[in-house]
């Protein structure tokens, strides 16, 4: 029997804020994370993502606002239902892997006799079974990170909070972690993870919130966020890239913006532009196409337009906190 209610959100933030002196790291913020969601907290470095997570976990105290976990005010009982992988990796380097994981599990109320089979299962899954009796300092940084992830999940939490979880992992281990997140979601767990790498959110999440300079600029199911964005896009693949061909596309009357990816072009249309007319005009110019498809905006496009280049650079003194 858990403390969760079927009708309550996994996490609800009501007007929480946090300042460090004159720096407003998080302005009054409202968020609702449904149970069972894979929820991406997106934003550039220094946006306030980590500060928000630390307030959820009671590492920091909000200046204002209320936080509800599974429908109830923050409490140790609620926090024990959360697994947390911090952005700052931290392990006891001289401890052995199995001993460290048993210690982490015990901190969350899991007895050693119960944690042993869980530890063995996760070490096998993460291809670390042969390092169970190695000291952490003998492991690579990537393997240390995998150990820390195992430590965050041994108590089988209902909610997982992962702060930049893919940082430091090679592509193979990034794929393994994505598979695990997908399995956890299928099992009904709520996954909240922060990232500034939009591709990860696009692949994994069903809900997102985009934060810039401590304020929420978009929030909701990904499909709804894309619909609300409003603009229509066309994906074009040229038979062969040439500067002249790209220039022709840019000059067409219905085109607002073009982003290049080799022979692939992402074209944002002006209000009222007709994609069929655009295709007709493009063919008439003699530009040879391999693909022309009306598409929805990518999260990356929405992120760039909502956040803006101005927020991509945040002063170093702010980054130290947020």
Give the residues covered by each predicted segment.
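Short, surface-exposed acidic/glycine-rich loop or hinge patches that mediate macromolecular interfaces
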Residues: 72, 216, 239-241, 272-273, ...
């Amino acid at each position: 029997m858990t403390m969760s209610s079927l009708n309550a959100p996994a996490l609800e933030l009501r007007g929480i804020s946090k300042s460090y002196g004159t720096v407003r790291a998080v302005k009054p913020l409202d968020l609702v994370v449904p149970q069972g969601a894979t929820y991406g907290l997106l934003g550039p470095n220094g946006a306030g993502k980590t500060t928000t997570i630390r307030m959820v976990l009671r590492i920091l105290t909000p200046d204002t606002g209320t936080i509800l976990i599974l429908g109830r005010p923050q409490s140790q009982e609620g926090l024990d239902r959360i697994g947390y992988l911090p952005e700052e990796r931290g392990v006891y380097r001289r401890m052995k892997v199995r001993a460290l994981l048993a210690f982490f599990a015990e901190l969350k109320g899991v007895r050693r006799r119960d944690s042993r089979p869980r530890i063995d299962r996760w070490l096998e899954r993460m291809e670390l079974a042969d390092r169970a009796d190695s000291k952490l300092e003998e492991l690579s940084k990537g393997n240390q990170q995998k150990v820390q992830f195992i430590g965050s999940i041994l108590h089988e939490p209902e909610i997982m909070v992962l702060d930049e979880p893919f940082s430091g992992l090679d592509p193979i281990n990034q794929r393994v972690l994505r598979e695990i997140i997908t399995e956890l979601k299928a099992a009904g767990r709520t996954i909240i993870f922060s990232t500034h790498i939009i591709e990860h959110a696009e692949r994994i999440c069903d809900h997102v919130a985009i934060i810039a300079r401590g304020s929420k600029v978009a929030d909701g199911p990904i499909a709804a966020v894309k619909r609300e964005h409003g603009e229509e896009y066309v994906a074009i693949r040229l038979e062969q890239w040439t500067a002249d061909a790209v220039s022709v596309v840019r000059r067409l009357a219905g085109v607002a913006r073009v982003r290049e990816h080799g022979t692939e072009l992402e074209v944002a249309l002006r209000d009222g532009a007709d994609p069929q007319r655009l295709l007709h005009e493009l063919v008439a110019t003699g530009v040879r196409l391999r693909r022309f498809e009306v598409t929805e905006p990518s999260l990356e496009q929405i992120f760039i337009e909502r956040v803006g280049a101005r927020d991509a650079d945040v002063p170093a003194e702010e980054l130290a906190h947020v």
